[in-house]
Amino acid sequence: MSKINLNKYKNVKRRIGKDWINLNPIQRGGVLPPESRETLQSFGDGYSTCDYCLEGRVDLVDSPPIDDLAGDIAKFVNMDEIMFTAGCRHAQWVALKALTEPGDVIVIDSLAHYTTYLAAENLDLEIREVPHNGYPDFELEVEDYADIIEEVEEKKGETPAVLFLTHVDYRYGNRINPEKVGKIAKKWKIPYFVNAAYTGGIMPIDGRRWKSDFIGFSGHKSWASSGPIGMLATSYEHSEKTFPKSEVKGPWSGRGFTKKIPQLFGCPPVFGAPIATLMSSFPHVYERVQNWDEHLENARWFVDKLEKIEDFRQIGQRPRKHTLMSI
């Protein structure tokens, strides 16, 4: 057996003190409350939630109430169904897999997360970008979605397969009105995906009002859970096609796995700490969202004070519409 220096892997700890405050804007939403740190200890073993699995999928476990959690989160964001995924990036891929064929065109905002681009690349899709106006605001004109749809239809003879909106981007924290894009999607009868990785769990979400067919969420970014974990919200209209059950059958053994979902690798890959902490943190997240207006005012106050320091300037939307910001 090869000799390996194992000492560097022992007693690995995060190099921050307990009295430190994490100000990283893309990490604040994923900070665990005290009760979830206890849950993390209890469910830290890899397959710990599988102790309770009788149905072959972690999302169907009823004690602890994982099945209830999916239903309650769906109500919380005003959508029909929630499925747990291996992060928002996985949620994007699952939805695009259901909605597209190789060579299809999708329209995305030019502030989209890199995982949106990679999901499209993985599925051999063509991308059209809605431009922004550059420094210092980096804002988009929602009406440009309609212009690009018309351009695609003229060139391809058909409309894009999906409209994709990043509710708040991770670089500048700009917030785009999802309802306005939703109206464009409905007018053209195009499926509509909202990436709410940095807003779900932070501020109020209303999928029906937005007219969204899909919403992607990130548990470890914005729902105070360990990771990786995400969620894909959808409507009953798209549910069956998005989460089809396995039909494979062993030609010799006859084995089948009829409760498994191929796009989720059989079972949502969130067993153990990710799903347990998401569940434990839900009351904390629910309360946090109720206080969104206060959090937003605090962010605006913070920007005002920082910009009184010489050479400090906030870039992106003014006034702030999200607590995530770039200075």
Summary of predicted features, one role per range:
Residues 1-22, 28-29:
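Conserved N-terminal helix/loop that builds the PLP phosphate-binding region
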Residues 88-92, 113-114, 135, 197-202:
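Short acidic loop-to-helix transition motifs that present clustered carboxylates
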Residues 25, 36-39, 43-98:
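Conserved N-terminal alpha-helix of the aminotransferase class I/II PLP-enzyme fold
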Residues 138-196:
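Active-site phosphate-binding strand-loop segment of PLP-dependent enzymes
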Residues 206-220:
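Conserved active-site segment immediately N-terminal to the catalytic lysine
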Residues 99-114:
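Conserved PLP-anchoring active-site segment centered on the Schiff-base-forming lysine
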Residues 219-322:
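Active-site C-terminal subdomain of aminotransferase-like
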Residues 58-62, 134-139, 167-174, 199-201, ...:
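Short, small-residue-enriched loops and turns at beta-alpha junctions
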